Amino acid sequence: MIRKATVMKVYKDKYDDYKQRHDKLWPEMAEMLKAHGVHHYSIFLLEETGQLFAYLLVEDEDSFSEVAKTEICQKWWAYMAPLMETNDDLSPVSHDLKEVFYLA
């Protein structure tokens, strides 16, 4: 498995909405992620800044790179766009993190 981590940003007045939408993650979104080899996906919030830290395991980069091309992912991005910083295609503005330590 490949460990991935990224940071994003949710607007400070949208924390509750962000959590509620993820608490009710669309079943087809969860199914698509699993079908593309995504496991143990967690998102954490730093409330002081709105920074989100996402951590997930993926089976392989090629399969994971296909996630963004799916119709359901693009619908999810549009659904979440009012709550967070996004790019022109409505994908979240995100920055991949470089792993500097791991203890198995």
From Swiss-Prot:
Family that this chain belongs to: Belongs to the rhamnose mutarotase family.
Subunit field text:
Homodimer.
Q: What is its EC number?
A: 5.1.3.32
Q: In which pathway does it act?
A: Carbohydrate metabolism; L-rhamnose metabolism
Catalytic residue positions: H22 (proton donor)
Q: What does this protein do?
A: Involved in the anomeric conversion of L-rhamnose.
> Catalytic activity annotated for this protein?
alpha-L-rhamnose = beta-L-rhamnose
Q: Which GO terms describe its cellular component?
A: cytoplasm
An example GO BP is: rhamnose catabolic process
- Report the protein name in the record: L-rhamnose mutarotase
Pfam families noted in UniProt:
rhaM
Q: Name one GO molecular function term.
A: L-rhamnose mutarotase activity
PANTHER family in the record:
L-RHAMNOSE MUTAROTASE (PTHR34389:SF2)
From which lineage does this chain's organism come?
A: Bacteria, Bacillati, Bacillota, Bacilli, Bacillales
Report the leader peptide range: none
**Where found in the cell?**
Cytoplasm
Q: Which organism is it from?
A: Shouchella clausii (strain KSM-K16) (Alkalihalobacillus clausii)
Q: Which UniProt keywords apply?
A: Carbohydrate metabolism, Cytoplasm, Isomerase, Rhamnose metabolism
| Enzyme class per UniProt | isomerase
Source taxon at top rank? Bacteria
Q: List the disulfide bonds.
A: none
Positions binding substrate in this chain are: Y18, Y41, W76, W77
